[in-house]
Structures are given as C-alpha cells and as structure tokens.
C-alpha cells in the first residue's frame, strides 16, 4: 500500500465501504534491485530450512510463550544505541579512522598518547583538527573528519576495555562540543546536501554502494555520537557538562541553522532522498540522527508527562488521576490466545462433551482476572460471519445465568494472586454528561436544555446520583481547553486580544515543518513501507540499502549470511527510528496545541498510514520480536576492543542469547501507539480499522506476552467492538474480559454493544472535512500573517507617530493633489481644538 502522493485517502462516504485491501504479501522481505539475496537462499536445501527454522525459533503455534522482561523507555541502553549506528559492512572503517588520526597526531605530538595528554593539550589538538575541516581539498577534509570521528569514538586504540572506551567517548565528545565542532559539521553537512555533482553521479549509477556516501556517513556519525552522548546523563558527569547539555539542547531546537531548527535540515534530506534526487544519502544514519535530535530538543516520555502536569496546572485543570507510565510498568501480561491447533482440539472436545463445555464457558466468562485469554477461541482468520458450531443456539452468557449452575468456588490460594481493582481511574467527558442529561430530560420531562449540566429539576433521585458520580470522574483534557480557546479567538478576534504564543521547542519545530509537513509525512511512510518485513521489492520502490551494501557483492556463503543479517538489522533500525520520530512528534504537538497534532495526524491518515501499520502487523509478530538479526562480536565497541573470532555459519545462526529483540518490540509498541493516536475519538478512522479487517491481525499480536503491547492492542480492539457485530463478541468473550480488565473505562461508554449513537453509520467524510476546516482556520490565524484580515490588524492612534511616518503616494494622486485638498480638506469643517486635545 503506497503512501498517497497528496490529497485525502479513501475515507468512507455515505456508509459505502471500500473493498478490503488485497491479501498481504508474504512476511519475507525481498531486497531491492542490486541487493544481495537472502542468506538462506544461498544455502543447500536442508541447511536453508534449518537456518529459517532457527530464525523463527519458538515463535509459531505456541500459545504459552514466556513473559518478556521488557521495560519501555525513550531509548535502549547507550551501548546498544551506539552499535546500531554502524552497519557490519562499515567494520573496516574503524581502523581507517584510527590511521587518519594517528598520522596527524604524530606530526604534532611524538612522545605521548592521546590518553596521556592534559586537558589543555587535548583542547589545542581538537581546535587544530577543527581548522583542518576548512581546507578546500576534499580528500584532506575527509581525512581530518575521520580523525575527529576517531576521537568521538573514544580513541579506542589506546583502551583495553569497553567501559574505558565509553568513558573516553564522553570526555572527548564534550571536548569537541566545547571547541565548536558541531556547528562546523552542520556547515559541512549543508555543503554536502547541496553537492550537485555527487547527487547527479549517484542518480546515474545503476547500483549504489557504501562508497558513494562516505563523506556524508563520516559527518553524520560524528553528529550522532555528539547528540546521543550529550543527551544521556550519567552519574559522575562534571558540573560544566550539565550546563553545556542545556545550552546544546536550546541551540539544537532554535532556528539557528538557515533560520530553521536543525531537525528541518534532516527532514529536507529525507524528502530529497525519497524524491530520487539524492539516492546516495545514508538514510539509516539520517533517521537515527533525526530521532535523537527530536528527542534531545523536545524531551522524552517522562519529561512529556511532567510538562503535561505543569500545563494542566497553568490552565487551572485538576491534576492527572494517575501517572500512566507507572501504571503501565506495574501491569502484568495476560496469557495469549490459544493457537489454531489448540482451537481444533477444543472444538473436538466440545463435540464430545457439549454440556460440560457450556458450564466451563460460563465459569470462565465471569471476569477471570488471572488468564483472561485462556481457552479463547482465536482462529487465524476471523470474519464477522464466522459461525462457531459450539455456540449455535446458545443464549448469551448474561441471559442464562438463572439456568446455569453457580460458578465453582476457587481455592483461597488462587484468589490471592488476582489483582485487586482496575488499574485505571474511569474518566467522563463534559459531552458525555450533557448527552446523559439530555436523554434523561427528554425521557422523564419531555424537554431539553442544551448544554446545561447543572439543572436537575424534576429528574428522579437515581438520576441525581448518576450525575453526581459522573461529575466526580469528569476529566477535561488540555486538548478540549485549547479547542475552546481557539473557538473564542475566531468568534471575537478583537476582544480576545493578541494571542501570546510561547516559543517552546515544539512550537519552533512546528513552524519549521508547517510549509512542507505533508511531504515530510509521505517521505517517512515511504521509507517505513520499504523497510517493513512484509514488503515486496518493486521496481519503483526506493532503495534504502545504499549505506549497507558493499562495493563488491559477497562471494561465499558465510559472507552472504553475514550480509543478510546486516540487511535485516538495517531495516529493523530504520523502522525503530521512524516509529519513534512519529510518536514523539504526535505527542509533543498534541501537548503544545491540539490542532498541530490534528494537522500532522490528518496528513498521516491521508498518506495511508493506517493500512500501512496494519500491513506491518500482518506477519508472524512473535517471529519478528524474537528475530536474532545481530552479530554481537561485530557490535561496537566490542569489535574495536577485542580480537574478532573467526565467524562460522553456526555462530551466525545462533545470534545472541536474548529472549527478544529490544528494538523490534520497541518499534511494535510505537506503531500501535501511533495507530491508537490516529483513531482515538475518530469514528471515520475507526471504521477504516474495521474495513481493513484489523481485528484478527490485532488479536494475533496478543500472543506477545508483554503488558504494554497488549494494552495498546486491546485499546484498538475496544474502539471497534461496537462495529464488529454480535457474533464476533460472542466468539471473543475472553478478549472482551481482558479489555474490561486492562483498558480505562469511560463511564456511559457503551463500547461492547452497538447501541451508541456514535456507532451508527453517518457520513464520515463530513467529520474529516469539519476537522480539516478547523485546522486550516487555526493555521491561517496563527501563522499566515500575510493573509490576515486588515480590519483586525492593530492601528496606531498616536497623532505624532502617524504624522511622522513617510508615506509613498501614487503618481496619479500627486498629479491631482490640489483637487483632493479642495474636496477633502478645505470644503469640510474641522474642529482643530477637539482634534489636538
């Protein structure tokens, strides 16, 4: 599903649902033209099957997978984030960097190592290297850049352990930052972006390799190491380093680079790459640097939570009912649904013992808090019209409570393990209270009072109690307040006064993104599509492997296997970076102003982001999360400190010993959160989830036993349940119970049934059009000063300043000046005393 090249995507009009997408491609990604064949394809038949089997070890057909000890955070561990910057193909360049540094260093210092010099000598040599970046000869400049990269990599040739390398990295990078290296690198990067000769040469080449992006890769490596290291706070950091960190963050988010924040330059590189004008750009490094730049300037998720609490207090709203990060961390994963083979066995048992099966079904329906998915019938492909034979003629569980025997008493020990209470405090919107009161008034009194939520005259006592409970759990979001304030500005532009827009980093970034935001979103989604494991190689798809393919293709099976792992790892890192960038931007824009968030979200929807994410999840997700596409002995800094052992096919197949791949689980959670943000309270987009048959895809993702991932899957299933029909709900009672357990409740939200007014099939196109009109009015009012209404512009009423202004009069007026003077001045009486008072 290609991201759209422009206008709105296929929304549902007048309840005419578009046809579902064609069957998804197989879950094995084919590399673009010029890429190496998958490693397994070069092996003999039995060996290839064994290799593929090991790659998918313990990921198919096992409902009882172990709990994943995964803690969601802004980033992975520092060492892991550093190692993912380099592809394994770049390995030989570490020694090249060292050689360039030592050749230059020995000219100036003959008797000492870098680690033996004092701070002043370090600073002197760093400034000498910086001066070397200003030479015009490209080869000399590249050698100096490599020497600086070696310093930023921790001068590993003089270190004996990984910890020592990381310690010297921090010291060296703050030293480089102090002497002004980053700004010099930005200028060089700008020059390389505009290097027309390199771009035209790359466009003409049939196959682009690592050598075409050497200059860019060296610059981006240094900049990434600086941003990533300065952003990370460590115990034992010097006091001046904290000051430098704050200054660097402020500069990085300010419009200091071509009057734009640095992130806009990187977004420009992404769009230039996707347009085909610069196919040699090393996109993985650009996206990683873009992610870390956005993270450094805007702040991570914990910082976002504190900013949200602060903003609520400024707007006079009550504090948040709970810290969502802490609640999610304390949640436990539920058992995943049974596999298809388990379902067949269950159906056979039901055929033999139908009566007992019904009793067991009822017992388990009573909100089993320990294993809400246990014995859930999760077939691989579920449709609305599926008929489960064991449920034919069966009444709904709640309707047969009188007939069925009471639930069996569980032992007391079992009860002790059950979580007490629900994890989230319920919420109610002002709109929900209004709707409840309106329906109650029309039912009991026969009148309505609009948006009045206080008058309860004539309503029965139970209704009073209900309203009291609803108001106790009333939650007003920052977005609602911002939307109301925007309506007020548009309704009364004069009395409202001038809006004071605080220039926080998110505001500065949005102003930079605004002119080309649709193009940026389309470009990111194009790269995400190319990197997704379910994508097939197409002749017109972009080649994202320019910075991983060597100049000479591998000639042995072992080299092919190594390159196959490298290519898969490369794609996984790209997915990780894009998912993190999109989620960070959505969350920060929503906090800064709701219409900034809606503008970005709407363009993601128009570019087919929803079906793209569903296509990503339409694979064996356990296989993706447990994939072992890494070679730990080749990871930095291990590879520069220790002697490399001889690689064998067995060691490559074994991969690492981790239970799961951190970056892949992180990417999956991010994509689910993005999907949740795009569809929340948007019925037209929720219908897209239904039309694209997302329910079975999402249910398969519940097999991953990780609480946070399960929570966001259940949220996405919850918004659809009212549209999926009675049969789906009957067949998935365990999933319904899990939603009740783990997802926040909205009082009066009839999510489990189709009775809600919002669930009825309206013209959903109108909903998107109204939202788009609000967004355009907001952008025009706040940012489009050139087209603002002249009647509402401020007027200078001071006589002296007005008379002192120089006015350029048109020629025809000057020629007829006497006539104007006679008509407008001399023939009209003027009370000069009143005028001058």
UniProtKB/Swiss-Prot annotation:
Keywords: Acetylation, Cytoplasm, Phosphoprotein
A biological process term (GO) from this entry: negative regulation of hippo signaling
Location, primary (coarse class): cytoplasm
Biased composition (Pro residues): 18-35
Region listing for Disordered, in residue ranges: 1-67, 333-423
Molecular function terms, GO-annotated: protein-macromolecule adaptor activity
Sequence positions bearing N-acetylmethionine: 1
Residue spans of biased composition, Basic and acidic residues class: 47-60, 356-377
GO cellular component: cytosol; FAR/SIN/STRIPAK complex
Low complexity compositional bias, start-end: 36-46, 333-343
Quaternary structure, from the entry: Part of the core of STRIPAK complexes composed of PP2A catalytic and scaffolding subunits, the striatins (PP2A regulatory subunits), the striatin-associated proteins MOB4, STRIP1 and STRIP2, PDCD10 and members of the STE20 kinases, such as STK24 and STK26. The STRIPAK complex can be extended by adapter proteins such as SLMAP:SIKE1, CTTNBP2 or CTTNBP2NL. Interacts with CDC42BPB. Interacts with CTTNBP2NL.
Functional note: Plays a role in the regulation of cell morphology and cytoskeletal organization. Required in the cortical actin filament dynamics and cell shape. Part of the striatin-interacting phosphatase and kinase (STRIPAK) complexes. STRIPAK complexes have critical roles in protein (de)phosphorylation and are regulators of multiple signaling pathways including Hippo, MAPK, nuclear receptor and cytoskeleton remodeling. Different types of STRIPAK complexes are involved in a variety of biological processes such as cell growth, differentiation, apoptosis, metabolism and immune regulation.
Entry similarity comment: Belongs to the STRIP family.
Name under which the protein is recorded: Striatin-interacting protein 1
UniProt source species: Pongo abelii (Sumatran orangutan)
Taxonomic lineage of the native organism: Eukaryota, Metazoa, Chordata, Craniata, Vertebrata
Gene, per the UniProt record: STRIP1
